[in-house]
């Protein structure tokens, strides 16, 4: 529900895997802006929770040749990495190239065992075996700006390869997690991904009008490899790439056109259109997500009124339309296995389809109204209210298989409707002589909210545990974030911050699954010129508000030095 933009284009990978992270070069980030309220209407229904806008470093104002080298090390997994950048600014042109690489070993964790499918698996030396990896990134950015015209062009490629902990992949087997004496090797099972992105911005400005267009192509190719294993004896070894368990090849075309009209010094309007087309192809001897293609388009209007430096009011509306076509997928080997297990033909017919063909169309509107009030330099108040909706993802409609990154069998529901809800948030900031306080409460009500829920139903797939199914329900969210910041003795800063989220399933009068616990951070920082040292105590509370068939989680304390 949060869109991530890089150079004006939404990042599109396999978002069904929250364990995947973002295929972005962390060294190549100039500024990060967080957008909430009406401004998020510019980016589509999947930005209902806000937008993280990542932009490249600013262009130098004078002609020059420049570069930098950055080195990185981490003790938690023995990371060794670095990045090299070279850039040139000449007249109307600016160009930059960057290469980054990281190598890391097995992750250290503060436990000697984990539980996988009710079995305790040892963690030798408190290192997760085979979780080492490598990352290689290269990117090129160029910009031309002259008078009223501006254009930029970007090409990037991100490659990652990471091992899977073998104790939570496939059939439980303690012998697979025995220490092999090498904490930096990558053996089967592992995952690898390559993300190619090509984007361009074209912009022309008149006195009171700015016309801009963002266009992009992305290819996200993710694969998961594991020594061929079958839970059904009749499944033969594939002739080609026998150890390729899962593969997803996602192609995305994106385009957006926006017109910004500056009516006066206090009034500004924006009109826009955007569209996106995706196609996802699959391969491998296992199944998690079917092939599909998806198209979305939207129209938007946004306006901002700022009569003075004290108050600013903004509002906007957006209409989105989407279409998704999901292909069916039959598992004949599962059907044979179930027959041998004594299932009747009606049950076999039900379970043998990993996914059924689905054709769905969605259309709905969103709107938002926001206020910023700054009565003085010390005080600032913000408030937003709006209606939002989101199209269901392909995984929410049709996933059906074991997701090894999170150790669970995830299943979609083709009957899900679009997500719809009302959201309201506010914030208050006070700054006074080295002291600041910030409080940000929020509340959201969804008439239909889609979430992954533990069902308590045992999967017919062997060694898969219970099924986690995407479900729609009426839901209430409420919570707050708060921060107190104190600057003292010239070089010291103390910050205490906390966050709390309350979730409630109105249909069944219980909490939502995977509700985050209350957490707090106490951070003491010393800084002088370019040198900064800090110590932090992070407290995570116990979570007793859980869904049915979900375990309670104990609290934890983490201590950080940096």
Regions found by a protein language model. Give the residues of each.
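N-terminal periplasmic accessory domains that precede
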Residues: 1, 5, 19-22, 34, ...
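Short acidic/polar hinge/loop motifs at secondary-structure boundaries
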Residues: 9-36
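Outer-membrane beta-barrel signature, preferentially recognizing the C-terminal barrel domain
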Residues: 70, 75, 179, 183-201, ...
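Transmembrane beta-strands of outer-membrane beta-barrel pores
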Residues: 71-77, 90, 101-105, 146-148, ...
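Transmembrane beta-barrel wall of Gram-negative outer-membrane proteins
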Residues: 77-103, 116-165, 194-207, 259-267, ...
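Flexible loop and strand-edge segments within Gram-negative outer membrane beta-barrel domains
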Residues: 129-135, 149-207, 211, 217-251, ...
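Signature of Gram-negative outer-membrane beta-barrel scaffolds
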Residues: 268-379, 402-404
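Gram-negative outer-membrane beta-barrel transporters
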Residues: 309, 442-446, 450, 455-545
